[in-house]
Amino acid sequence: PGRSVAVNSGRRALEYILRRLGDVRCVRVPLYTCRTVVETMERLGIPVITYRIDERLEPEELPELEKGEYLLYTNYFGIKEKCVDRLASRYGGSLIVDNALALYSPARSGVASLYSPRKFSGLPDGGIAVMDAERSLPEPEERDESLPAAAFLLECLEHGQERASAACERNERR
């Protein structure tokens, strides 16, 4: 279910989703999440409200969401499928699923999801935004450059892994 758009990174997939949703007043994000998730929202001027998760990696409390509020849930390592299903039933289009660590998790009807294939494959970058849409999603208005992200692979081939390690680390931090 849903249509997808390929972008350059998981953070760009999240940005694409947030821009397509339109009037996003705030997003509730788990405390245990990648810093790039919060940085993406800050860059877009979207307020972030954090929530706690329990030892099962599930929200301690399920908030009531008002119009323009969204809940971002991280499908940790792809092991939280039942929780994603429960949240999708409760929140529908107000749920954004972060499947950056769950490449093989199916998209849910009516729910936006983001994926980061590079975390599962030998790819220097890559992201996928999935949204439930009646028609094809438009291409992103702007794209990141992929060349800087892939340069360390060529450096590794030509000069060895040791010499390319600093470039690889820079790619991971971007």
Please provide the spans of the model-predicted regions.
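Short, Lys/Arg-enriched charge-dense amphipathic segments
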Residues: 28, 50, 122-127, 162-169
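Active-site phosphate-binding strand-loop segment of PLP-dependent enzymes
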Residues: 54-151
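PLP-dependent aminotransferase class I/II
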Residues: 2-5, 10, 33, 53, ...
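PLP-dependent aminotransferase-like
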Residues: 3, 12-90
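Generic low-polarity alpha-helical segments
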Residues: 14, 27, 97, 128-129, ...
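Conserved beta-strand scaffold positions in the cores of enzyme catalytic domains, especially
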Residues: 4-6, 48-50, 95, 113-114
